[in-house]
Amino acid sequence: MSAHGTNEGALWGGRFESGPAAAMAALSKSTHFDWVLAPYDVRASQAHARVLHKAGLLGDEDLASMLDGLGRLAADVASGEFVPSESDEDVHGALERGLIDRVGPEVGGRLRAGRSRNDQVATLFRMWLRDAVRRVAAGVLDVVDALATQAAAHPSAVMPGKTHLQAAQPVLLAHHLLAHTHPLLRDVQRLRDFDVRAAVSPYGSGALAGSSLGLDPEAIAAELDFDSSAENSIDATSSRDFAAEAAFVLAMIGVDLSRMAEEVILWSTPEFGYITLADAWSTGSSIMPQKKNPDVSELTRGKSGRLIGNLTGLLATLKAQPLAYNRDLQEDKEPVFDSVAQLELLLPAITGLVSTLEFHTDRMAELAPAGFTLATDIAEWLVRQGVPFRVAHEAAGACVRVAEARGVGLEDLTDDELAGVDPALTPDVREVLTVEGSIASRNARGGTAGIRVAEQLGGVRQLSESLREWCR
């Protein structure tokens, strides 16, 4: 028997006379994706060694030797000198092999006492994910800050607000840009909330029933920066709701980015003409020399579907698994790893795109009153004069009909035409028949009036900075 047992590169084997068939080994192998957990595995092993020593299961010399070996192994993993071999089943088996190669089987073989791959991988996955979501959150906040900077640069620019993609009411461009920051800020808050639930360590739960060796799960939890250890060992080793929760928030970020990306695509068309994309954040055509394509936005739309697919695939994997651990859970990591990787590609590109958008404010101002976007202002002006809204709504609609028949805007109707629709429509109504007047009148909290948008911008920046403290 070799120093590594009857099944080198795996953490099992004594029950078996020989190793697995080649097809079985290929099916079981996970080092091609779980190697990203290697630094966390080494760190957790160092904590585990100290707990074994505290419990009297590892002598002083063996502890020193083991920690020295783990330190050298960590350095070799970081440098790329130590990598999985073809025989390694997973990251855990590879690292145990690496440790034994450095300190020998007598010392290296003691590390496995009191822990199972079941509690080990559940812990490492949480550790990795807690770090990963902070990186993602920081990237989301970069997008938020880019939007806020653009909003601050265009404090009085106006544009047509839309519902159903049809002209609705005029709004400030800054108000529209900030509307994209709020869902993204909520996404970061969701990641922060997720972290509270993820900060519970499964370590010490063993395969499913806990440990009989007098180990201290709370000590390991504290050393690995968890808030506490798990209360139920079965739940700790078999639950992956933390992964599903993270996958949902990552997918939601993709959805929120895709909504903004769709607008960038539309706004950059000649039909809209709101924006010009920077050369650095667009591409050309292999046959049409005039093209300037919004590939960042289109890839964002596409990758948002991928993130949703990762979420639904993970949920399908988790569905109907009996307690406790099942090998199905080998499939839990790749969807989440991929979602994080896709967002780490997307977020810097979206930030660069937003930061360099050139807004054509004259074009937006020209279109702001188009489509009779001031009709609601007529109705609400009448309400302020004491006219019931039902009547006011009818009168405003009649004004639209008259203007449409003449081929003019509402602001071009004569005093006689307005009075002919409703005597209450005196010349004073013209105070709201301008885009600027309409916007200024919407000064309730959350409205598009400049004073409210300025307050909102300050709040967005303050919240973004506060959330960055958590990311660090």
UniProtKB/Swiss-Prot annotation:
Q: Which GO terms describe its cellular component?
A: cytosol
Q: What is its EC number?
A: 4.3.2.1
Xref: Pfam families = ASL_C2 (PF14698), Lyase_1 (PF00206)
Name its pathway. Amino-acid biosynthesis; L-arginine biosynthesis; L-arginine from L-ornithine and carbamoyl phosphate: step 3/3
Q: Which reaction does it catalyse?
A: 2-(N(omega)-L-arginino)succinate = fumarate + L-arginine
Q: What PROSITE patterns does its record include? A: FUMARATE_LYASES (PS00163)
Disulfide pairings:
none
Tell me which domain of life the UniProt entry assigns to the organism this sequence originates from.
Bacteria
InterPro entries per the UniProt record, alphabetical: Arg_succ_lyase_C (IPR029419), Argininosuccinate_lyase (IPR009049), Fumarase/histidase_N (IPR024083), Fumarate_lyase_CS (IPR020557), Fumarate_lyase_fam (IPR000362), Fumarate_lyase_N (IPR022761), L-Aspartase-like (IPR008948)
| Entry's Gene Ontology molecular function annotations | argininosuccinate lyase activity
Q: Which UniProt keywords apply?
A: Amino-acid biosynthesis, Arginine biosynthesis, Cytoplasm, Lyase
Where mainly found?
cytoplasm
Query: Where does it reside?
Result: Cytoplasm
A GO BP entry: arginine biosynthetic process via ornithine
Q: What class of enzyme is it?
A: lyase
**HAMAP family membership:** Arg_succ_lyase
| UniProt family annotation | Belongs to the lyase 1 family. Argininosuccinate lyase subfamily.
Q: What is this protein called?
A: Argininosuccinate lyase
Organism name: Rhodococcus jostii (strain RHA1)
> Upper lineage ranks?
Bacteria, Bacillati, Actinomycetota, Actinomycetes, Mycobacteriales
